[in-house]
């Protein structure tokens, strides 16, 4: 079967003024160690929305880093992959070398190769190149037949959540508050349930998403409720929660997190803040209460493999998060929907 798109391909890029454009471009040449993948599904991430609608949007900015698809062509020197293979492709891939300070210390997402590697021209294209570096450093995972491409497009965001969880200590029957219950916020709730947390509080301003969170046996609270801190403390024996995950870019949410985390608890900064953002914190309070602050950026290929296993084994049912699908030609409409969040969780683009 011929899966190729021919000599031309479509890609989506930032046009400026809060718009995207779909461009027909010449298909780039395939290197002897590269592969072409026909995108079947790609999720829209909050960082993609920020690129389009935020103050950092600029023409030609690449979009899409959650793609999965079918291999359409392979370079002459490629081993272990074949045309027709169904794959997840990771955009950034570290070196994993013992000689790399970052990788050898478990900070793979800080590796310079992680930043320099990528899919070409981007994941949000009907076809894209996976370069040799990604291919030979575990950046491509073959998919079991029972996993759909839409599920595979959820591997990367779930992997990001898993990486965050690997950065702090917790115990069964602990309590957690998740601030911001978009797709990754719900994934954090799913992981908390999987890991045996006794109390899961979900906070947001979006009533649709709060109602959605109730499906996962959580206690939901509007984050603008003036009694949030009192409610959480009353439910936790006046102690506060063991863990707070801030799964939003809101700095107000980050500040609020310190008001209802317990002594010796952990605040996880997961949502992506805007560049240059600053907040005021009472460092004396943080010090005296021994509050741990953890940051988590992106995911390594250890995390993507873990995410694939959790999805494949049905430990995490990511299908529950997919509410809308759009065709590549409808990308502008898809991004506007993702920005509004109206009755939506995860939005997937298909080609």
Each model region followed by its residue ranges:
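Short glycine-centered segments of the SAM/dcSAM-binding site in methyltransferase folds
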Residues: 86, 175, 265-266, 292
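C-terminal hydrophobic helical "lid"/dimerization subdomain
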Residues: 2-7, 226, 255-259, 301-351
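Glycine-rich beta-strand-centered segment in the early N-terminal region that forms part
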Residues: 28-42, 55-101, 141-144
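Residues in the short beta-alpha loop(s) of Rossmann-like NAD(P)-binding domains
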Residues: 205-206, 273, 299
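Mid-domain Rossmann-like dinucleotide-binding core that forms the NAD(H)/NADP(H) cofactor-binding site
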Residues: 145-226, 230
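Glycine-rich cofactor phosphate-binding loops and adjacent beta1-alpha1 units
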Residues: 168, 211, 216-290
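NAD(P)H dinucleotide-binding glycine-rich loop of Rossmann-like/cofactor-binding domains
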Residues: 97-179
């Amino acid at each position: 079967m011929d899966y190729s798109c021919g000599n031309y391909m479509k890609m989506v890029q930032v046009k400026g003024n809060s718009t995207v454009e779909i461009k027909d471009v010449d298909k780039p040449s395939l290197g002897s160690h590269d592969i072409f993948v026909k995108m079947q599904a790609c999720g829209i991430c909050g960082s993609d929305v920020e690129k389009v609608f935020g103050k950092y949007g600029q023409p030609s900015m690449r979009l899409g880093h959650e793609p999965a698809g079918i291999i359409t062509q392979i370079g002459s020197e490629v081993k272990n992959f074949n045309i027709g293979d169904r794959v997840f492709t990771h955009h950034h891939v570290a070196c994993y070398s013992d000689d790399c300070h970052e990788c050898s210390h478990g900070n793979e997402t800080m590796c310079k190769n992680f930043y320099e590697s990528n899919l070409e021209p981007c994941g949000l294209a009907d076809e894209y190149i996976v370069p040799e570096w990604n291919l030979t450093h575990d950046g491509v995972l073959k998919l079991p037949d029972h996993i759909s491409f839409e599920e595979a497009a959820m591997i990367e965001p779930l992997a990001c959540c898993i990486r965050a969880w690997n950065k702090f200590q917790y115990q069964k029957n602990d309590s957690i508050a998740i601030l911001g219950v978009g797709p990754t916020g719900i994934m954090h709730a799913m992981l908390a349930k999987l890991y045996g947390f006794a109390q899961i509080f979900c906070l947001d301003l979006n009533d649709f998403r709060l109602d959605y969170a109730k499906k996962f046996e959580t206690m939901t609270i509007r984050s603008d409720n003036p009694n949030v801190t009192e409610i959480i403390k009353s439910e936790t024996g006046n102690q506060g929660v063991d863990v707070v995950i801030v799964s939003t870019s809101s700095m107000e949410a980050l500040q609020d997190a310190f008001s209802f985390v317990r002594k010796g608890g952990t605040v996880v900064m997961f949502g992506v803040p805007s560049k240059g953002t600053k907040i005021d914190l009472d460092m004396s309070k943080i010090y005296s209460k021994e509050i741990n602050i953890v940051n988590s950026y992106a995911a390594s290929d250890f995390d993507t493999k873990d995410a694939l296993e959790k999805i494949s084994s049905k430990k995490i049912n990511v299908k529950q998060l997919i509410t809308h699908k759009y065709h590549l030609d409808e990308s502008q409409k898809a991004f506007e929907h993702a920005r509004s969040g109206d009755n939506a969780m995860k939005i997937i683009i298909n080609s």
